[in-house]
Amino acid sequence: MNIIEQIEKEEIARLTANKTIPAFAPGDTVIVNVNVVEGNRKRVQAYEGVVIAKRNRGLNSSFIVRKISSGEGVERTFQLYSPLIAGIEVKRRGDVRRAKLYYLRERSGKSARIKEKLVMKAKPAAVAAE
């Protein structure tokens, strides 16, 4: 491991010390709580939408969230380890077969829907043996 990788790993550990980042993937509906500073006031703003892309590059990791606001599509790019992000909450898991969902930009309404990923729960060993 070279010096740059070591420094990036330490920086990621420092930035994630007080917050947890859940595992999410493209197709998931997430709520990103963003710290917004307006003058001398600081507040948390929730931004909810579908993750259409995720870029895993260590400290430079980012993701794009798309939502429909007043009939217009709005996309916002977030840095995963940014101090402006107060928290990320996964609201719904999406079942998609692509890593980048840029095709959703041309779609609207029912054709832009994403199937929900259903997680099968493992049966206890006692029930499975019978």
From Swiss-Prot:
<comment type="similarity">
    <text>Belongs to the bacterial ribosomal protein bL19 family.</text>
</comment>
<dbReference type="Pfam" id="PF01245">
    <property type="entry name" value="Ribosomal_L19"/>
</dbReference>
<dbReference type="GO" id="GO:0006412">
    <property type="term" value="P:translation"/>
</dbReference>
<comment type="function">
    <text>This protein is located at the 30S-50S ribosomal subunit interface and may play a role in the structure and function of the aminoacyl-tRNA binding site.</text>
</comment>
<keyword id="KW-0689">Ribosomal protein</keyword>
<protein>
    <recommendedName>
        <fullName>Large ribosomal subunit protein bL19</fullName>
    </recommendedName>
</protein>
<dbReference type="InterPro" id="IPR018257">
    <property type="entry name" value="Ribosomal_bL19_CS"/>
</dbReference>
<dbReference type="InterPro" id="IPR001857">
    <property type="entry name" value="Ribosomal_bL19"/>
</dbReference>
<dbReference type="GO" id="GO:0022625">
    <property type="term" value="C:cytosolic large ribosomal subunit"/>
</dbReference>
<dbReference type="InterPro" id="IPR038657">
    <property type="entry name" value="Ribosomal_bL19_sf"/>
</dbReference>
<dbReference type="InterPro" id="IPR008991">
    <property type="entry name" value="Translation_prot_SH3-like_sf"/>
</dbReference>
<keyword id="KW-0687">Ribonucleoprotein</keyword>
<dbReference type="GO" id="GO:0003735">
    <property type="term" value="F:structural constituent of ribosome"/>
</dbReference>
